């Protein structure tokens, strides 16, 4: 069975998912794993229309795929976690009413922290040696684990501007997975850290190839080449 893994979307579902549709057809994809960060984009924290359109598009797309026999797994990204916790971050949408509407939309996506794909542990940012996956990470997130999600949301390493030794599986920098590898889970697939392309030659594979930055002319530019990862279980 073939699985398609998709990195951070950041309000680009309407741009990326039509491309994904073609890949589903071409490669006979039966499972899709989104690695989180569906929300928030530099310079768009007041763009209510973009949040509404993109998230409703994503939700409708997921329902359509599931109705057509495709399994769709949605993982939690660091940006998503603050909505689930009901705590606005500086990069969250600023309108409070819309913030909580986004929270409900994210809950409708049925999010979880991690997914085990054969030998590969899949998560938003990756598990370094400081964090091991817990049973609840592989199940639908519920309020029962709010305190634990809060810890993940606020454990940020120095490479991401925090004070912890290393980041949680929502916040770990890709370099942390190289410098502080989790020996129990050497093979991982992660997003979060922008990559120019996908390199499958190493144990830890980064697939965040859709990230943008704003250039000196105040225009959006892609950091990566838009690669997607197809995993074939044979």
Task: Show the residue positions of the predicted features.
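Internal, conserved structured core segments that host functional sites
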Residues: 76-90, 111-126
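Active-site neighborhood of phospho(di)ester-bond hydrolases with catalytic His/Asp-centered motifs
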Residues: 6-7, 32-36, 74-78, 122-123, ...
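Active-site environment of divalent metal-dependent phosphoester hydrolases
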Residues: 10-14, 39-43, 79-85, 128-130, ...
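Beta-strand-turn-beta hairpins that frame and shape the catalytic cleft
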Residues: 1-4, 115-122, 201-203
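Conserved beta-sheet core of the metallophosphoesterase superfamily
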Residues: 170-232
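Active-site-proximal loop/helix segment associated with metal-binding centers of metalloenzymes
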Residues: 96-100, 104, 112, 117-180
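A general structural motif
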Residues: 1, 27-30, 69-71, 118, ...
């Amino acid at each position: 069975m073939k699985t398609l893994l998709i990195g951070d979307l950041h309000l680009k579902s309407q741009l990326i998912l039509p491309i994904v549709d073609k890949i589903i057809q071409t490669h006979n994809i039966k499972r899709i794993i989104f690695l989180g960060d569906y929300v928030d984009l530099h310079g768009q924290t007041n763009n209510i229309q973009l949040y509404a359109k993109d998230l409703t598009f994503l939700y409708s797309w997921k329902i359509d795929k599931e109705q057509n026999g495709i399994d769709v797994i949605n993982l939690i990204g660091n940006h998503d976690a603050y909505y689930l916790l009901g705590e606005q971050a500086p990069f969250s949408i600023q309108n409070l009413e819309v913030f909580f509407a986004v929270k409900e939309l994210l809950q409708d996506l049925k999010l979880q922290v991690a997914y085990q794909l054969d030998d590969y542990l899949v998560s938003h940012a990756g598990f370094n040696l400081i964090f091991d996956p817990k049973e609840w990470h592989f199940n639908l997130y519920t309020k029962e684990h709010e305190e634990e999600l809060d810890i993940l949301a606020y454990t940020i390493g120095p490479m991401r501007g925090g004070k912890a030794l290393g980041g949680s599986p929502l916040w770990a920098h890709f370099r942390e997975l190289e410098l502080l590898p989790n020996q129990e889970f050497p093979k991982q697939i992660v997003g979060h850290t922008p990559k120019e392309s996908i390199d499958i030659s190493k144990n830890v594979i980064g697939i965040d190839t859709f990230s943008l930055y704003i250039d000196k002319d105040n225009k959006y530019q892609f950091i990566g080449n838009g690669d997607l990862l197809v995993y074939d279980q044979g």
